[in-house]
Amino acid sequence: MEYITRELERKFLKLNDFFKVILVTGARQVGKTTMLKHLADSGRTYVTMDNAMARELAESDPVLFFQTYKPPILIDEVQKAPELFEQIKVICDESDEKGLIWLTGSQQYKMMERVRETLAGRIGILELYSLSAREKAGMVFDTDLDFSLAALQARQRKLPKNDVLQVFNHIWEGGMPQVQGVDNELRQEYFNSYIDTYLMRDVAEAGCITDTVRFCKFLVGCASLVSEQVNYATLAESAGIAPSTAKEWLKVLVGLHIVYLLAPYFNNELKRLSKTPKLYFCDTGLCAYLSMWLTPDTLRNGAASGHYYENYVVMELVKNYAYAKSKVNLTYFRDSNAKEIDVFVEENNVIHPLEIKKSASPDRREVKKYSVIDKASLNRGNGGIICMCEEPIPIDTDNCFIPSNLI
């Protein structure tokens, strides 16, 4: 399979010139190792902690491990050998070389606290997701997303027109590199193997889940609630477990980068706001497989198509900003009257409000609810309605209809 350029490469290389250690996190099979091997020169050692002998050496004698596998080094699945972190700290303190140690990890819940305690100030941490629609199309931008009409029009000129069939093919197929272009039979076998071989094994290693049958039911239950507010009672009922257990299990899925929780927006000046996050799958292909959508067309024409489209757009935004130069905060707005705005992009104390609609011609009156931002001392920037229109179209001076392929 031909290598697909990843948007994270630019940011990784920049941090590599600044930090001595770089950690790339993300779900299993999203391409972390492939990207780093592509970027590495021939002198960088590679070792994976999936190798039992290498892992045993790392656990029993970290000093000897680094004598055997000398830096510069790429260590895969480092969360399996947390004993290495103290020795990595020693190596960093004894060397001035940048980019000396590259790490990958796929279990955030088990690893990040140890990393931050041991390697504070020495490590840069990045997250890689499954392939975005832009990456699959070979369109990697070097400028951050800008919601002004002029910037959107400039981006539009570099891209083909928005196409609902292509969008839902991407949603159904997902972004796992190994399923790109394969037939339906192989796709189903891949996701079945992914759950059995990787996900269930990682869940078992988490130590808090022993009933894998119920956990599979819980996973399917999560897929049925995609793009909705988290409801622990409903999730618990889907697997025959207690709501408190459902809450713990959802934390595991977040830690494994399977599920993404979009936090609710909070501001002291705006009263009675929701405190419940919304649930999205990091990879829509896995979600579609769990819900047994057998073709892109049945998904596109099904009752859940709007929810999947929202999941797709939200995760494209998440990926875009995870790889961007600037730091933003993504939330959603919902008050006690069920007034909801799908996404707030908060950047430099400016809020860009966004609605998500599968329609090619949504109601422009949707943007009127953005005035809720003006009720507080908040700065409102350009926003709009992300939809299936073919080109950016102004709604008013601040908002546009935004083709989803521009995100």
Q: Where would I find each of the regions flagged by the language model?
A:
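Conserved catalytic/switch belt of AAA+ P-loop NTPases
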Residues: 85-109, 116-117
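A short beta-strand-to-loop transition that corresponds to the Sensor-1 phosphate-sensing loop
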Residues: 104-108, 114, 129-131, 387-390
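Residue-level preference for the first positions of well-ordered beta-strands
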Residues: 21-23, 71-74, 100
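A cross-kingdom feature that marks ATP-driven nucleic-acid transaction machinery
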Residues: 1-29, 33-49, 251-252, 257-259, ...
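Interdomain hinge/linker elements that couple catalytic modules in large macromolecular machines
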Residues: 138-316, 328-331
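Short glycine-rich substrate-engagement loop in P-loop NTPases that contacts/grips substrate
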Residues: 44-72
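Conserved P-loop NTPase "ATPase switch" module shared by AAA+ and STAND
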Residues: 68-84
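Short regulatory helix/loop adjacent to the ATP-binding pocket of P-loop NTPases
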Residues: 109-125, 137-142
